[in-house]
Amino acid sequence: MKTKCVRHSDAQGMVEYALILLLIAIASLLILQLSGISVRDVYCRVASGFGANACGGTAYCKDDFSNLNGWKVSAGPATGWKIVNGQMCADSYGTLANKCSMAGMPSNDYVAEIDGAKLNQGNGYGLFFRATDSGLGMNGYAFQYDPGLSGVVIRKWVNGAEINPALAFKSMPGTDWYGAAHKLSVKVQGNTFIGMLDGVPVLTATDSTYPSGGTALRTWDSTQVCMDSFGVNPIAP
């Protein structure tokens, strides 16, 4: 009589391999969540790399800078902002409010962004968010690309004045701040704000002073900067 031998080693190896893959997947998800990146964000970036528009949605506000009709100078010289070759360019200090977002949006939570921003001179530029114009200046917050501080920073503003200390600051020594185009964006959700540079989270701040508000562009000192486009989008689920 022949005896049959059942081999368990191959099956056990497959189970162990599957468990390892599961642990790697769980760890990756936790890292993404801690970094403020959703799985959908990753999928959208990969799909976009292959030319797909799988994550298209309706922007709350957007501007390709074909003209200045959607903007209002809130501070600084009226001639400080110009459309040059399809880009929004600033050659001075000032604040330029986005009329669409200031008029109100479907949600107080959003992602505001400027794309293709190239700083040629000066101490930096930034994005106001959850902002309103008090008549004395902006109330709200600003996320700033700030070579003057050699870093990026999120500040609270009251009646046109920035409040110290900053809500969040990240030093970036050794960064070449000039001549390269960047995407500056901020994810605004509840009382938590995540500042991103080229799609990568770089700092997080929390504050509950301003629960709602629109967006604006900001420059200071002798800044010269041009940017390709602007948008305020819903947060991906």
Explain the meaning of each model-derived region.
Residues M1-D10:
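N-terminal leader/signal peptides at the extreme start of proteins
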Residues L197-A216:
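Short, solvent-exposed beta-strand-to-loop segments that form ligand-recognition rims
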Residues S92-A161, A236:
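Secretory/extracellular carbohydrate-interaction modules
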Residues T79-N98, G213, R218:
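Short carbohydrate-recognition loop motifs
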Residues F65, A112-I114, Y178-Q189, F193-G195:
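Short tryptophan-centered beta-strand motifs in secreted/extracellular beta-sheet-rich domains
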Residues G160-K183:
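Short, aromatic/His-centered strand-loop micro-motif at the edge of beta-sheets
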Residues A54-G76, D228:
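Extracellular carbohydrate-recognition regions
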Residues D10-Q33:
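N-terminal single-pass transmembrane signal-anchor helix
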